[in-house]
From Swiss-Prot:
Subcellular location: Cytoplasm
Residue ranges, compositional bias (Basic residues): 61-75
One GO term (biological process): proteolysis
Cofactor comment: Binds 2 divalent metal cations per subunit. Has a high-affinity and a low affinity metal-binding site. The true nature of the physiological cofactor is under debate. The enzyme is active with cobalt, zinc, manganese or divalent iron ions. Most likely, methionine aminopeptidases function as mononuclear Fe(2+)-metalloproteases under physiological conditions, and the catalytically relevant metal-binding site has been assigned to the histidine-containing high-affinity site.
Protein name (Swiss-Prot/TrEMBL): Methionine aminopeptidase 2
Disordered as annotated region, ranges: 1-91
Function in brief: Cotranslationally removes the N-terminal methionine from nascent proteins. The N-terminal methionine is often cleaved when the second residue in the primary sequence is small and uncharged (Met-Ala-, Cys, Gly, Pro, Ser, Thr, or Val).
Listed EC numbers: 3.4.11.18
Organism phylogeny: Eukaryota, Fungi, Dikarya, Ascomycota, Pezizomycotina
Binding site for substrate: 199, 307
Annotated organism of origin: Arthroderma benhamiae (strain ATCC MYA-4681 / CBS 112371)
Molecular-function GO terms, alphabetical: initiator methionyl aminopeptidase activity; metal ion binding; metalloaminopeptidase activity
């Protein structure tokens, strides 16, 4: 908000000055007879009266008090830890837009096409919800980078610190039935260390502590009315890992640059792989080529469906394969993963991530615990992914038998951690982009990445 200029100081009353001068003139004038008789004294009288007039003006100056200066209004800033709802900081819902990128090559006409600009202006609600979610993601991750993600911190403290920030900034704490469906976490916070690339979040009782030599991927989502912003970054404290992080960050930026309406997925994957695999990492005297993890992909994002639902599309990060094209109006998570290992991940470690299967067929459930849990999942998460800590937070106890029954019945999908070979290091960077009619908007772009 622009600061209000301080009001001007009160001006002198010129009328009173003028009145004093006129009074002096009358006193000095008098009758001609008196002037003739007292000619010698009249000059002194005029001097005295002029002095009196000056004293009167000075007295008036002293009587007029200066108005107190109004305090300048300062723009509200986010607290630390983040607790101020974003709508308080942006009361008019004029949230910052993401990075605007013009379409390349044959799609460049869209940038200037009047009809496309008109269609784009019609999507204000859609854009407002995405931009709100993106700004929350930026503010929370910047706090996490400065205050939470440090050697010696537990993964549980980091995850809960991020999630508490998101809930406060959306204004929805998710403790009342259905509240998490209005706004909140788009999916659980992934904190994936070293050879683990994705889908690891601490369960209750987790004691893992972040170490100085770790490479950790931080992946979390924010949603407003089901509009999910999916963005991730990698943290390494030892600069020896900088080439790995740079390779993956540049590969993601290449994917964003190549993405666009009518662009083939295979072309994007080829460009990503070429960029990433031009780097190598030297560790303890050994050079490791950085490989794109070939069985991990970017993806479309649907409303309340992180992977786009049954008609979702995948964005490969290696060459070959899918000839499907991107289309106008779609939302994509452009994410790339690099590894010093085999460049291929498998299920490993304890599962934390789950999600209800969209449009799952009706299945009879024999376990009452499974029935009750499925009802709770429907009412609180819908098709949004959740983790076991979220069930703990809602007061659920001894639910693992029912949860496993829902998975085996095909009503809920389990997403175990995805890992390359032990001893390897993996990195990830990810942004959400909107293929608007006239431009693509990198909605989650920030100053950090």
């Amino acid at each position: 908000m622009a600061a209000q200029a301080a009001p001007e100081l009160a001006k002198l009353d010129l009328n009173k000055n003028t009145g004093s001068v006129e009074a002096n003139a009358v006193s000095a004038g008098g009758s001609e007879k008196e002037e003739a008789e007292n000619e010698g004294d009249s000059d002194d009288d005029r001097d005295d009266e002029q002095a009196g007039g000056s004293a009167e003006v000075n007295a008036e100056k002293k009587k007029k008090k200066k108005r107190p200066k109004k305090k300048k209004k300062t723009a509200k800033v986010q607290s630390s830890p983040p607790r101020i709802p974003l709508t308080t900081l942006f009361p008019n819902s004029n949230f910052p837009e993401g990075e605007i990128v013009e379409y390349l090559n044959e799609n460049s006409y869209r940038t200037t096409n009047e009809e496309k600009r008109h269609l784009d202006r019609m999507n204000n609600d859609f854009l407002t919800e995405y931009r709100q979610a993106a700004e929350i993601h930026r503010q929370v991750r910047q706090y996490a980078q400065k205050e939470l993600i440090k050697p010696g911190a537990t993964l549980t403290d980091i995850a809960e610190g991020i999630e508490d920030g998101v809930r406060h900034l959306t204004g929805h704490m998710g403790l009342e039935e259905g509240d998490s469906l209005v706004a909140g976490m788009g999916f659980p916070t992934g904190l994936n260390i070293n050879h683990c690339a994705a889908h690891y979040s601490p369960n209750a009782g987790n004691k893992v502590v972040l170490q100085h030599g770790d490479v950790m991927k931080v992946d979390f989502g924010v949603h407003i009315n089901g509009r999910i912003v999916d963005s991730a970054f990698t943290v390494a404290f030892d600069p020896v890992f900088d080439p790995l992080l740079t390779a993956v960050k540049e590969a993601t930026n290449t994917g964003i640059k190549e993405a666009g309406i009518d662009v083939r997925m295979s072309d994007i994957g080829a460009a990503i792989q070429e960029t990433m695999e031009s780097y190598e990492l030297e560790l303890n005297g050994t050079s490791y080529p950085i490989k794109a993890i070939r069985n991990l992909n970017g993806h479309t994002i649907g409303q309340y469906e992180i992977h786009g639902g049954v008609n979702g599309k995948s964005v490969p990060i290696v060459k070959g394969g899918d000839q499907t094209k991107m289309e106008e109006g779609e939302t994509y998570a452009i994410e790339t993963f690099g590894s010093t290992g085999k460049g291929y991940v498998r299920d490993d470690m304890e599962t934390s991530h789950y999600a209800k299967v969209p449009n799952a067929p009706s299945v009879p459930l024999r376990l009452s615990s499974a029935k009750n849990l499925y009802s709770l999942i429907n009412k609180n998460f819908g098709t949004l992914p959740f983790c076991r800590r979220y069930l703990d937070r809602l007061g659920q106890e001894k639910y693992l038998l029912g949860l496993n029954n829902l998975v085996s019945s095909g009503l809920v999908d389990a997403y175990p951690p995805l890992c390359d070979v032990k001893g390897s290091y993996t990195a990830q960077f990810e942004h959400t982009i909107l293929l608007r009619p006239n431009v693509k908007e990198v909605i989650s772009r920030g100053d950090d990445y």
